């Protein structure tokens, strides 16, 4: 056991990286020192630091802890890391330590990693960070059930036409010639935790540019990634490994959660002429409804408002009647909405709409989501 005196600018994450390796678990330091809030460190505070341990190599990528031993290599690159495949398993060979990690599976043009860090676990070990984010219980409930339909905090996909997708909502780099949502997530990380951004991305030449708050572009060594040739670079296994490792950091995870719930600002609280001048937040107000709408927006963002408008028309009610009405009216709209969204958009309809809806509905039976009207409560007004 070692002892360390907290210095200005220290976080549990960077202390863990310094003493336990770059994938060191800050939660172990917190446990040993009885720290319940990971952002409550004080300059001069004495911490006990456990001795680093080398974990066994796991055999399945979906349960493999990618252990970042690249701390002494700045920047880590293909000289320090090589990649091999065994069947469909992608293995990172860390040449400075001899360690091998099965961290993903190959598919088509790239790879995928299911990840091991679940939002439900972060809700427990990251509770102090969630308090800092000022997340409401309703927002946490909605995030838990919708993230189950998407991915883990360290999930990666590089095989489809979006080039690189990351995290609980699988934010994408964007197709060739198009902006993507992943740069907006990284921009949020850069603004809130610049040291973490620099460690995981900036030191490798990554930056964000031309942001509009929702989408933007990545640049690599000063060059904006725009066309297919530019973005194809991000299919390289080294980038998947870097993003997977970043997705294991509690501060990066907290930004994912905040960025995910902030998606509601894009569509749920905004009045729409398609909805007769009302906002969805005035019409569908249960946690169940918000979870369904958010899940739809992640999958098919341009479909949500129109599909709800069609559900209202099908019900024979006006938006004003729904806004002033009872839970029965909301239940009717949801019923019609779920029927319509299975085919809304034709060939481009929501992926697995029925299965995703049932997954969310199951949370009602377990008491993790409320179907009651006005049960959804947002803290968006008090967040900075």
Predicted features and spans:
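Residues at alpha-helix boundaries and the short loops/turns that link adjacent helices
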Residues: 23, 35-38
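Primarily a LysM-type cell-wall glycan-binding module
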Residues: 1-23, 45
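Residue-level detector of conserved, well-ordered beta-strand and adjacent loop positions
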Residues: 7, 30, 50, 172
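Intrinsically disordered, low-complexity Ser/Thr-rich linker and spacer segments
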Residues: 1-3, 50-61
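Cell-wall polysaccharide-cleaving catalytic domain and substrate-binding groove, primarily
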Residues: 13, 26, 33, 56-246, ...
């Amino acid at each position: 056991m070692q002892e360390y005196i907290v210095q200005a600018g220290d976080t549990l994450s960077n202390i863990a990286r310094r003493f336990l390796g770059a994938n060191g678990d800050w939660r172990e330091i917190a446990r040993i020192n009885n720290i319940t809030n990971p952002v409550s460190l004080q300059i001069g505070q004495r911490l006990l630091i456990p001795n680093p341990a080398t974990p066994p190599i796991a055999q399945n990528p979906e349960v493999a802890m990618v252990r970042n031993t690249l701390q002494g290599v700045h920047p880590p690159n293909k000289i320090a890391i090589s990649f091999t495949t065994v069947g469909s398993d992608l293995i990172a060979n860390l040449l400075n330590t001899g360690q091998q990690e099965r961290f993903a599976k190959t598919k088509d043009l790239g790879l995928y990693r299911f990840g091991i860090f679940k939002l439900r676990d972060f809700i427990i070990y990251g509770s102090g960070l969630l308090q800092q984010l000022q997340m409401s219980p309703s927002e946490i409930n909605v995030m838990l059930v919708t993230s189950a339909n998407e991915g883990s905090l360290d999930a990666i996909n590089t095989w489809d036409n979006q080039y690189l997708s990351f995290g609980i909502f699988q934010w994408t780099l964007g197709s060739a010639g198009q902006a993507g949502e992943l740069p907006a997530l990284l921009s949020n990380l850069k603004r809130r935790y610049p040291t973490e951004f620099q460690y995981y991305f900036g030191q490798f030449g990554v930056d964000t540019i031309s942001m509009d708050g929702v989408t933007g572009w990545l640049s690599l060594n000063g060059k904006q990634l725009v066309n297919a040739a530019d973005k194809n670079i991000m299919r390289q296994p080294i980038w998947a490994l870097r993003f997977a490792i970043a997705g294991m950091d509690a501060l990066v995870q907290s930004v994912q959660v905040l960025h995910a719930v902030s998606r509601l600002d894009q569509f749920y609280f905004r009045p729409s002429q398609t909805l007769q001048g009302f906002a969805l937040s005035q019409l569908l107000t249960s946690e169940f409804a918000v979870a369904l709408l958010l899940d739809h927006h992640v999958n098919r963002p341009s479909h949500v408002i129109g599909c709800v408008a069609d559900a209202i028309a099908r019900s024979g009610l006006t938006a004003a009647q729904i806004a002033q009405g009872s839970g029965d009216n909301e239940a009717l709209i949801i019923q019609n909405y779920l029927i319509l969204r299975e085919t809304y958009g034709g060939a481009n309809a929501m992926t697995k709409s029925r299965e995703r809806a049932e997954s969310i509905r199951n949370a009602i039976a377990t008491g993790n989501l409320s179907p009651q009207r006005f049960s959804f409560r947002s803290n968006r007004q008090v967040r900075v």
